[in-house]
Amino acid sequence: KNERIFRLQFEKPLTIVLEEPEVHLHPKLQSAIADILLDAYKSFNFHFIVETHSEYLIRKTQVLVAQMGFESNVESVEKSPFVTYYIPENSKPYSLGYRKDGKFMESFGTGFYDEASNLAFELL
């Protein structure tokens, strides 16, 4: 009954802005944020704008897209609920888009996904 009342109050999408929700969280919990956001989106039609530097959170969105068969840039019921923008230094933001396998259609600039690999190679 409470859920029904809650849903009635939010018939229109509610947009919530989260700034670095991963701060001070263990990597496993950082990735779980994506599950929570997807559940809130599907259950209550909540929309989120999330500013993050968490590779774990972003990678989890890719996993969810692959598991659920979502895809960007298609007009269908299975359109991805996630939209990821990369904001390069001294340049304009751009959407990465998701393929059905969860991989991005565009690439991140240097210094994000490649940073951990670069540091590992320095140890060799």
How should these model regions be labeled?
Residues 1-120:
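Switch/communication elements of ASCE P-loop NTPase nucleotide-binding domains
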Residues 122-124:
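Conserved helicase/translocase motor-coupling segment
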